[in-house]
């Protein structure tokens, strides 16, 4: 453990979290990601090899360097709790989870329409924020209002880092695919981007 900490101490400002003993490939990913000033990086390890840990290490390093403070994680619904608990337990990073059912409640309780702008670190499920084309019983105006409130408010919240877990799910054969639109909008929403 001390050898790993000594090897990483030379080039990194963040210290390793007490519960983290990074594997060599995770240190390699951290090194590669931090080689450039414009981090737009794909973490494409196999399932179970610790992409969330790699992302957490990159978050810690970017925060230590003062490069990010507002972070958005968008992931499949089934991974929201895992992301929140791993960031808290392993990196001591508290993220606000915003589920679809929370949106109106937060807006009412805070009397603030900028739901996502109220929190510096947010985790939200991908399918709950993707743009919709139509909805049964809704007029075009209501669909547009929904998209503006949910999707465009998250896109325009001034994120420093956007992390998309399940990025392979945004691929589509046409630019009209809702997840593709979401991925494209999120990729433009911040200077730093991690795709998992």
Place the predicted regions along the sequence by residue.
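Conserved P-loop NTPase catalytic core
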Residues: 182-189
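SF2 helicase/translocase NTPase motor core
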Residues: 7-25, 31, 38, 52-54, ...
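Hydrophobic anchor at the beta1->P-loop junction of P-loop NTPases
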Residues: 43, 73, 196
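The conserved Walker
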Residues: 47
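Interdomain "pre-motor" coupling segment immediately N-terminal to P-loop NTPase/helicase cores
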Residues: 1-4
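Conserved helicase ATPase motor motifs in RecA-like P-loop NTPase domains
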Residues: 189-196
């Amino acid at each position: 453990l001390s050898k790993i900490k000594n090897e990483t101490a030379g080039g990194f400002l963040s210290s390793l979290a007490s519960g983290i003993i990074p594997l060599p490939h995770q240190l390699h990913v951290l090194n590669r990601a931090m080689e450039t000033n414009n981090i737009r990086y794909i973490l494409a390890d196999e399932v179970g090899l610790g992409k969330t840990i790699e992302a957490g290490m990159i978050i810690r390093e970017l925060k230590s360097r003062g490069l990010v403070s507002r972070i958005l994680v968008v992931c499949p619904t089934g991974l929201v709790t895992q992301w929140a608990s791993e960031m808290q337990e392993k990196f001591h990073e508290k993220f606000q989870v915003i589920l679809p059912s929370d949106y109106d409640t937060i807006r009412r309780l805070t009397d603030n329409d900028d739901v996502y702008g109220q929190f510096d670190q947010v985790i939200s499920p991908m399918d709950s924020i993707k743009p919709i084309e139509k909805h049964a019983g809704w007029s075009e105006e209501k669909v547009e209002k929904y998209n503006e409130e949910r999707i465009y408010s998250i896109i325009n919240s001034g994120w420093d880092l956007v992390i998309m877990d399940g990025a392979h799910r945004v691929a589509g054969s046409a630019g009209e695919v809702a997840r593709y639109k979401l991925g494209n909008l999120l990729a433009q929403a911040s200077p730093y981007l991690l795709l998992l």
